[in-house]
Design a protein with these regions (language model features):
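Glycine- and acidic-residue-enriched helix-capping/strand-helix junction motifs
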Residues: 47-57
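Structural motif
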Residues: 3, 100-103
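Acidic/glycine-enriched edge-of-secondary-structure segments
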Residues: 2-9, 62-81
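Positively charged, small/polar-rich N-terminal and surface patches that mediate targeting and assembly
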Residues: 31-32, 53, 69
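Glycine-rich, Arg-bearing micro-motifs that act as flexible, cationic patches
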Residues: 105-121
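Structural beta-alpha unit
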Residues: 70-99
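Small/aliphatic-rich secondary-structure junction motif
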Residues: 1-47, 129, 133-136
Length: 141
């Protein structure tokens, strides 16, 4: 069965990401491993590392339950704050052959920090794997 590595945070659970995952499922059985990078934004002036990690874990669990309820086979983990490092770290542990590709879900160009960092292209260059880039809208967690 094909597996896809999905990296998302603010767009995790968006209709656009769900559609991209379903498109892969339409091509045959597959499963998804979600990686939610720790995100240092949001309400509040300061966040501790444990608060950031807990927020990412909560966001991950809500998305995992939602995707599973919609019939998708999903596992997941919290990753490094950098989406590139988060993907590379998972591939170091599991191996590149464990995944058919990477789905990167970002905010729209006008507001995406990940796109300013060229994250989808950097993930492709660093991994040599096919990358599907999805532009989604933020989901309130």
């Amino acid at each position: 069965m094909r597996r896809y590595l999905v990296v998302a945070h603010q767009t995790l659970g968006s209709p656009e990401l769900l559609e991209a995952m379903r498109q892969q499922l339409d091509q045959g059985p597959c499963a998804f491993h979600l990686v939610v990078p720790e995100y240092h934004g949001g309400p509040g002036l300061t966040w501790t590392e444990s608060q950031v990690r807990a927020e990412a874990a909560r966001h991950l669990e809500e998305a995992r339950l939602s995707f599973t309820a919609q019939g998708l086979a999903v596992t997941g983990e919290v990753g490094d704050a950098s989406p590139v490092d988060a993907v590379v770290n998972v591939l170091r542990r599991h191996g590149r052959k464990a995944y058919a590709g990477v789905i990167v879900s970002t905010l729209p160009h006008s507001v995406s920090k990940w796109l300013r960092l060229d994250a989808p292209a950097r993930i492709q260059r660093n991994t040599g794997m096919p990358v599907i880039h999805v532009i989604g809208h933020p989901v309130d967690a």
